[in-house]
Amino acid sequence: MDARSPSRSGSAGSVEADREESSKRLEKTFDPAHFEERWYRTWEEEGRFQPVGPPGSPRFVMVIPPPNVTGRLHIGHAFGRTLEDILARWKRMLGYRVLWVPGTDHAGIATQMVIEKELAKQGIDRRQLGREKFVERVWAWKRDAKDTIQSQIRRLGCSLDWTRERFTLDPDLSLAVRHAFVRLYREGLIYRGRYVVNWCPRCGTAVSDLEVVHRETEASLYRIRYDVSGVPSGAVVATTRPETMLGDTALAIHPDDPRTAKFRGKTATLPIVGRELPVIEDPILVDREFGTGIVKVTPAHDANDFASARRHRLPEVVVIGPDGKMTAEAGEYAGLDRFEARKEIVKRLAAENRLLGTDPHRFSLGHCQRCDTVIEPYLSTQWFVKVGPLAEPAIRAVETGAVRFVPEMWTKTYFEWMRNIHDWCISRQLWWGHRIPAFTCANGHVIVAEEDPEACETCGSKDLEQDPDVLDTWFSSQLWPFSVFGWPKKTQDLEDFYPTDVLVTGYDILFFWVARMIMAGIHFTETVPFSTVNLHGLVRLAGEKMSKTRGNVVDPLVAIEEFGADALRFTYASSATSGPTVTLDRERLAGSRNFATKLWNAARFTLSQLEGKPHARSLEGRALSLPDRWILSRLSTTAADVNRHLATFRFDEAAQALYGFLWHELCDGYLEMVKPVLSGRDGDDDAREIARGVLEHCLVDSLALAHPFMPFLTEEIWEKLTGRPGTLIVSPYPEGDPAWLDPGAERAVERLRALVTRVRNFRGERRVSPTEPVALSVEASPEEVEEIRSLEPLLRHLARLAEFRFGPPTDGAQKDIVSGVAVGLALPAGKAATDRESVARRLSQVEGEIGELSAKLQNPAFLERAPGDVVEKTRRRLRELEERRAALGTAASE
């Protein structure tokens, strides 16, 4: 059933009864600012965003990827939220009880950085304020940022249930975080230890592997000579970081490398410092295929060296502190920045003839994702999650299809990461976030508990100190799909709405967030948190992902003010390809606004035809004309196509199908065909009534089809058309009525439009006025002649023909193949001389298009990935062009 049925949408027969005949008309000029805010308020006040529906109706649940409270949303966030809202509105109109949960993320490190920058503008350091006052400042910022973000999302038209809005530091969600931490700790999956971690000196905290961005960097490889007992030539060690050599506690060789056998059991002396270093044998650490076969071991500043030190019981000497400056262990270099120390140490080595040379070296250098500071491997005590046992069930969930990724290509990426996953450092040396629920008593006992303990459970001491660190933001975010519903409490919402159905998010947080949610969902709730993950591309500006901390953010409200929310939304939808990058520009936004204006004007025309004029209230059993049958068939096909594309998350193809139907077929096609009937120049009263009824039916279903993409515009037109304000959002979604499908009518009108297009192009090629009369001849089979003869009145009207006949072309006429039939085109006497340049130009254009289509059909990727009907359409177009080339070649030779 589709929106044609009065029981579903009130189209055709029932619209008339509700319309106030002398009514409110659409303004002449399309100005979305006049109605966007009003419609959002209406929907919200009437509870349209809440999950209501008849008993037994299916449900559809999503949780928003919570935006960070670092400030305003950028145009990239708005992209993802638009795609989610298209799904929510589509499912709601299909009869689902839709719940889409809003919320925001405290975003520990990102938000703290923003506030520190704001304080720096006032000459204030957070340490001057102290932890409590600083956190108060962040809470004040959060309140303003949340209001701003909520306002932006509302302006975009997102149909979120604001009565269920959540924040990751809300009391209930904080309880969930503590519960999860304590449970994992008691299960032995959270542990505390001293390890080398990724450290950002600028942010002053440890960061996870995923928060490190690696970039290829040109550097120098320094060759340094170490004295070795019993080996007069010493040992040559190469390093890119001579400043760390002050923390060396050994040299290492491979036990099976004959080149370094002379160093076995020897002792080296550390240059500058004079510390004795044992030469150890470590086949895991040393790659005998690389370099000299002997390496320095700096346990406190390299993760691999740290592991080797644990195997060989080596001491750990920290020479670079958490601020990126050299420590007291660095002796005379203490207090210097690490990079300044490098220069001074290189000078000293050169002066002592220990620097044997430098070589250019290209390697991958880690940078902080947030501030771009070079990451320092740093030995410190941190909290970790043992991820391996959590990853195994999450891998199986995707293997068995319990969770699927769209596009499917991300499945392989997911497996590769999950099968090589490392333990997760979850502690952060920050003030803003979830404090780690671990307490140490005066006697050194550690208590991990959901509630703050009053005394040590081991010794009874009441002198307790909570761990100063906070949890990685992603620790709380991984619980989002179920913590928003009240977990770990067994709430009604948790029972009704968990697990969710679909997650829509950017591919860049597949590992940060999506994978961790799958692991957490399975571990804590024994089910996957969602069944489908749609990973979309990223909106980029000048080749870079948009980010508030990078300072390259574009506010979506700027685009909304200029083009309207519907135009921005439609631009997003039509740009949502399956690729990794989404490019937005003013040209696309202007094109979408033009599309909205086109629909607005079509609605104004339709309303002018319906107001006070008789029209068919039902199309059943009426004598429909060819244009009527064609547009109803195309409408039904388009409805089915849009549903199919949305079901497979091809928002771009759904938008293109909608655009093609509304602009090219309904407005430029059907309206032009029936204007003579509507104006009274052609046809009788019955034909006019039917045409008006068809026009109304098409507008009703078109508004419903377009609503998920352009909700404000369609609701405004719907009110004027039906007299039922605010109801389109819950009206049934057209799914396509097979009863209207008419392949014969589609084929005939496709041929008609191809002939009209060719005549118009002919005028353009000859550089004559669009109103210049043209003579057209058609040479075809008897069956084709019969079909084309039925098209003659429309053909003469649309193509503005001076003459039309069947038979061979006249002398001097331009020959061509159009829609499988031979045609001849000529200007009236006096203008009919053959224009060889025009023919040659047309032939060149056809040759170029043939080349493009041939290349496409020879591309294996196109043949494998494109839908079958698209491939077949391309082949058909190629055959037509080859026939046209033959005809043009003949004309050019005459």
PLM feature spans:
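NTP-handling and nucleic-acid-processing catalytic cores
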Residues: 28-30, 35-40, 155, 159-160, ...
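Catalytic adenosine-cofactor/nucleotide-binding cores of aminoacyl-tRNA synthetases and other
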Residues: 367-371, 538-542, 547-624, 722-724, ...
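N-terminal, positively charged nucleic-acid-binding surface of large information/translation enzymes
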Residues: 2-256, 284, 298-330, 354-394, ...
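Conserved phosphate-binding loops in nucleotide/dinucleotide-binding enzymes
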Residues: 215, 297-300, 339, 376, ...
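Core structural elements
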Residues: 147, 153, 594-607, 626-638, ...
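Alpha-helical recognition segments enriched in aromatics with Gly/Pro capping
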Residues: 285, 312-324, 430-433, 437-442, ...
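Acidic, turn-prone loop/beta-hairpin segments
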Residues: 105, 201, 208-213, 454, ...
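C-terminal low-complexity, glycine/proline- and small-hydrophobic-enriched intrinsically disordered tails
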Residues: 590, 719-894
